[in-house]
């Protein structure tokens, strides 16, 4: 993953590899970078594991899904991601899950995949303290909804700026023919 993120100019700020899916906070520097990096990493990893295990087919549930997120949601989403193995009862503490950015954030040191600085610069408390509170059920549902729909997550002015920049409608439209 780190090889392809480097090649296609994508920074990973947080991640958690779960048994059947992965969560990332990825910041692409180019328009196509995210699709190219994730797509190539997924293909290579799937091919390697399938060959090693004698398997065929997909390793992950569902397709690659992404959504643009306003900075206001960044910390809650990071908390959601790094606490995922705790919520799934795989570990008691997030730093005990070896396939997550939690340990890198707690130590304050980058690992081969994660750039810890952007998020550590925002959080004023030690990272362990930051992870001591889980996100609320409504926030979890919000993240899952935007992951399913691919619609941007942000307030009205954020969505409006995106619509202007991309020259397309992003807000939910009423069903039926458009006038």
Task: Identify what each model region corresponds to.
Residues 1-14, 18, 27-179:
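Short Pro-Cys-Gly-centered "Cys-loop" motif that presents a nucleophilic cysteine in a tight turn
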Residues 21:
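Broad gene-expression machinery/nucleic-acid interaction feature
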